[in-house]
Amino acid sequence: MAWHSPGRLVFAIAFIGTTLGFSFTASAQSGIASVYTGGRTANGERLQPGALTAAHRTLPFGTMVRVTDNRSGRSIVVRINDRGPFVAGRVIDLTPAGAHALGFSGLTNVTLDVVGRS
């Protein structure tokens, strides 16, 4: 089998993608959520602390994500409009409004599920 054959190419792309942290399935992602504030988001919007928006490293802007707090069981749906978090183990940065709706301040363990696009 040559290196450029379709089977090896798919394997190589999947290996590189998973190494870089991309997901090729619709499965949920779990990790730590944090609260953040700031000025402008990566898509050019002004960060609005009262909005249900969030930062994620790889999901496209406009992706709607259900964030479920694993401790309380509360869920919210946020729109991805920024990049981050840039701290190991964290999977999403939420606005203060998102954290308040989930009932936490600081950090919490969450599960993320993509629910659509805005």
Predicted regions and their residues:
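Secreted/periplasmic proteins
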Residues: 2-118
